[in-house]
A protein has these predicted regions:
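Conserved alpha/beta-hydrolase "nucleophile elbow" surrounding the catalytic nucleophile
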Residues: 95, 99-104, 217
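Conserved HGGG/HGGXW glycine-rich cap/lid loop of the alpha/beta-hydrolase fold
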Residues: 8-70
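Conserved acidic catalytic loop of the alpha/beta-hydrolase fold
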Residues: 78-96
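Active-site acidic short loop of glycosyltransferases
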Residues: 23-25, 88-94, 209-210, 237
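Conserved alpha/beta-hydrolase catalytic His-Asp/Glu region
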Residues: 132-135, 151-199, 203-204
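Short beta-strand/loop motif that positions the catalytic acidic residue
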Residues: 208, 214-216, 220
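Conserved alpha/beta-hydrolase "acid-adjacent" motif
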Residues: 221-227
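Flexible "cap/lid" loop of the alpha/beta hydrolase fold
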Residues: 105-108, 112, 118-148, 188
Length: 240
């Protein structure tokens, strides 16, 4: 059963959009990357349920956006505190957590500061501390966001993320779509991008005690493959 559901939490820290789908006994929490600053999970329950339908029998899946109104200079650790509050509100005492890119940075802090919440952890294409590659990417995206260049951000992200064939497809798609999906404000994106550039959980990784899988790519042009290796070396018993 897909059981897609769109929801919004009214927390002490502010409102937060989330989606839920699946009917399994196990709970999986998914945390998207910095693109959440451009488009949240609001209204995406059915598309996510269809995309990840293989999970819906074993898991009840939750995907959380960052809260709607972000404070200036919020850190990934602050965002992990918001996530903990959201899980508390939904009575999710313990879950498997999958964090992708910036979502992986938030997941690291959740596992460090609230280990009772995290049963198992998957960290995909993410990092534990800044490096020159991610600083350069974020600087480019920040400059584009400041001048409202939504299409530029999407194309640059695609060119750093995909094979040449996929890049050609992305160029064609964004050429046709133009500014479809462009947010009214880039403020959330800028705050999230800054939090990626300042994220540093490296020295705390050894405090993560749950079973952990790190997924990375040797040709990663955003966070680098070395970043995944660094994480795996620091977390006890981690698999890469």
């Amino acid at each position: 059963m897909l059981n897609p559901n769109n929801g919004r939490l009214h927390l002490a820290c502010g409102d937060m959009d989330y989606i839920r789908f699946g009917s399994g006994k196990r709970v999986l929490v998914m945390l998207p990357g910095v693109g959440d600053g451009l488009k949240t999970v609001k209204g995406m329950a059915l598309p996510f349920a269809l995309l990840y339908r293989r999970l819906t029998g074993e898991f009840t899946v939750y995907a959380f956006s960052r809260r709607v109104e972000l404070s200036p200079h919020m850190s990934t650790r602050d965002m992990a505190e918001d996530l903990n509050a959201a899980m508390e509100a939904l009575d999710l005492s313990r879950a498997a957590v999958l964090g992708v890119s910036q979502g992986g940075m938030i997941a690291q802090w959740l596992a460090v500061d609230h280990p009772e919440r995290v049963d198992k952890l998957v960290l995909a294409v993410t990092l534990s501390r800044p490096n020159d590659t991610v600083r350069e990417a974020i600087a480019v995206w920040t400059e584009m966001a400041q001048r409202g260049d939504y299409r530029g951000i999407m194309l640059d992200t695609a060119e750093r993320s995909y094979s040449e064939k996929r890049i050609r497809q992305a160029r064609a798609a964004y050429g046709l779509l133009g500014n479809v999906g462009k947010p009214q404000s880039f403020e959330r994106f800028l705050i999230q991008a800054e939090s990626c550039a300042t994220h540093d959980c490296y020295d705390a990784l050894e405090r993560i005690s749950c079973p952990t899988l790190v997924i990375g790519g040797t040709d990663d042009r955003i966070v680098t493959g070395k970043a995944s290796e660094e994480i795996a070396e620091k977390i006890p018993g981690c698999k890469l």
